From Swiss-Prot:
Keywords: Amino-acid biosynthesis, Histidine biosynthesis, Metal-binding, NAD, Oxidoreductase, Zinc. GO terms for biological process: L-histidine biosynthetic process. Zn(2+) binds at Q259, H262, D361, H420. Its cofactor is Zn(2+). Pathway: Amino-acid biosynthesis; L-histidine biosynthesis; L-histidine from 5-phospho-alpha-D-ribose 1-diphosphate: step 9/9. This is Histidinol dehydrogenase. Binds 1 zinc ion per subunit.
Length: 431
């Protein structure tokens, strides 16, 4: 059964603290096994990559067979249902429109001393996109990861996707084509992450790796971080719905289940000031649950990690929502904008009853790659800036150096870095 909390209870603070500390993933000790795979690919390249693909994906390939050719992509697109492809095109266009507004501007200015300062933005040259295969194939995630990279100006977007038994999801390939992926390889797991980071004879290395994956993929991303950049280590998905008596309980129940059906470790939370609404949502959820194809997954998620939190007044929900720092925050109240203005920590906010999270997942335009497990306290969802770098620019003339140089020399000497002081002093004809 889901957890029930009431902030009127004397032990609420301790129970809420325990709730925040709840672990939704039991991480197996896989680092050693993952490190062995990563090190093997780093040292033996294609040979290790092909061996791991045969072992884990039951797929025998040669080096040339790893890359998915244009003809195969075209055939996959033709095999897709036209209505779904049209939906992907709509999603692509809206995601691109949203992310183009995130493009930053260069700047160059002169300060009162006459020093020229500024910054310049440039795209990362090559990015690897990991896409899960098999039953967890989500073409929408291809769009969400690849399109911001292309908008940023990334030249090489390299997609890797496992094909257990040799089968690739046609919609994933269609999404890759629509999003502008430049290379696609039928490899997955920790070995694919290693290939992207270190490169092989077949796959040139990238500078950053993004995209979700299983525990081995997450462990591999941790191991290669530093050699390449990574987006984030994503945990199970989560939603918080804040609602008052004006909300529709059937809609809330559907949204809670939409999160629960993702994964048995997903989390769905309702915070409300209405005991009547809470009871109505529970009844609606129980009725809807039995009609879902993924009923076992959704039930496990709701029973194990679901929660209904009753608050005395709606304002009490603000600190709770900020503490949870949910990946998705839906606000179904009489004045959702007013509530949202008080929220500091959330991956994405969905305002009003007609904005279900599912719209943001697919066709809203905003990105659905969002921080989980309370990391919205310090991080943001994926965007254009994740695929760009800012370089500072500084220019002094003789006059400016004469003004700033003595202070730089003093600080260099104070820090025991005499060569620093000398590099300025020589230009000032000082020793």
């Amino acid at each position: 059964m889901p957890l029930r909390l009431d902030n009127a209870s004397p032990d609420f603070a301790s129970k809420f603290k325990a709730f925040l500390a709840m672990k939704r993933e039991v991480a197996a000790d896989i680092e050693a096994a993952t490190r062995a795979i990563v090190d093997d690919v780093a040292h033996r390249g294609d040979a290790a990559l092909l061996e791991a693909t045969e072992k884990f994906d039951r797929l025998t390939l040669d080096a040339a067979g790893m890359r998915v050719g244009e003809a195969e992509v075209e055939a996959a697109v033709k095999a897709c249902d036209s209505e779904t492809v049209d939906a992907l095109k709509l999603a692509r266009d809206r995601i691109e429109f949203f992310h183009r507004r995130q493009l930053p501007k260069d700047d160059r200015f002169t300060d009162p001393l006459g020093v020229e300062l500024g910054w310049r933005w440039s795209a990362i040259e090559a990015v690897g996109l990991y896409v899960p295969g098999g039953t967890a194939a989500y073409p929408s995630s291809v769009l969400m990861n690849a399109i911001p990279a292309k908008v940023a100006g990334v030249e090489r977007v390299v997609m890797v996707v496992p094909s257990p038994g040799g089968t690739l999801n046609p919609l994933v390939l269609a999404a890759a084509q629509l999003a502008g992926a430049t290379e696609i390889y039928r490899i997955g797991g920790a070995q694919a992450v290693a290939a992207l980071a270190y490169g092989t004879a077949t796959i040139a290395p990238v500078a950053k790796i993004v995209g979700p994956g299983n525990a081995y993929v997450a462990a591999a991303k941790r191991l290669v971080f530093g050699r390449v950049g990574i987006d984030m280590i994503a945990g199970p998905s989560e939603v918080v719905v804040v609602a008052d008596k004006t909300a529709n309980p059937d809609w809330i129940a559907a949204d809670l289940l939409a999160q629960a059906e993702h994964d048995a470790n997903a989390q769905s939370i309702l915070i409300t000031d209405s005991a009547v609404l809470a009871a109505d949502v529970e009844r609606a959820l129980a009725a809807q649950l039995t009609t879902l194809p993924r009923v076992k997954i959704a039930r496990a998620s709701w029973d194990e990690f679901g929660a209904i939190i009753k608050v005395a007044k709606l304002e009490d929900a603000v600190p709770l929502a900020n503490a949870i720092a949910a990946e998705h925050l839906e606000i179904m109240t009489a004045d959702p904008e007013a509530f949202a203005d008080k929220i500091r920590n959330a991956g994405a906010i969905f305002l009003g009853g007609h904005t279900p999270e599912a719209i943001g997942d697919y066709v809203g335009g905003s990105n659905h790659v969002l921080p989980t497990a309370r990391s919205a306290r310090f991080s943001s969802g994926l965007g254009v800036l994740d695929f760009m770098k800012r370089t500072s620019i500084l220019k002094c003339g003789p006059e400016q150096l004469a003004v700033l140089g003595p202070a730089a020399m003093a600080l260099g000497k104070a820090e025991g870095l005499d060569a620093h002081a000398r590099s300025v002093g020589l230009r000032l004809n000082q020793r």
